[in-house]
A protein has these predicted regions:
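Basic, Lys/Arg-enriched alpha-helical interface segments
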Residues: 1-88, 96-103, 107-133
Length: 133
């Protein structure tokens, strides 16, 4: 399965790398494992903790739907990566069913992102990026 890492998400990872190299590395490893997992789409669109992605050295994820965005017409999700320096970060994404891709829209610190506030700068950016796909 191909992952579409959007430009703003790339910038988020670049900024994370500048401040927390181990967390950025954990995010990149998780994305690589997701891309290599043939069941990733099912796992990433099912709410729950502990799905493992990848084969050789699987990573454990916590998957949740972004409910506020969904109620406003954006079927977006987020995952966190357990047992890594990136556990305090959330990867926000959507599944683009026409292209069968996971589109990574943002990597955010959990304390800096309020999922209920769609008027925040980061929420607007994520929603704009999703609608532009």
């Amino acid at each position: 399965m191909r992952i579409d890492l959007r430009k703003n998400a790339e910038n988020d990872i670049r900024q994370l790398r500048a401040t927390n190299i181990p967390a950025a590395a954990a995010v990149m490893v998780a994305l690589e494992q997701i891309e290599a997992d043939p069941k990733a789409i099912d796992k990433l669109t099912t709410h729950g903790d502990d799905p493992e992605v990848g084969k050789a050295d699987p990573v454990r994820l916590g998957i949740k739907r972004w409910e506020t965005a969904k109620r406003h017409g954006a079927p977006l999700w987020r995952f966190r990566i357990f047992d890594t320096p990136a556990t305090v970060y959330r990867v926000v994404y959507g599944y683009h069913w026409q292209t069968k891709q996971i589109c990574i829209l943002a990597v955010v610190h959990k304390e800096e992102f309020d999922y209920d506030n769609l008027d925040s700068e980061i929420a607007k950016r994520i929603l704009d990026d999703w609608r532009a796909i």
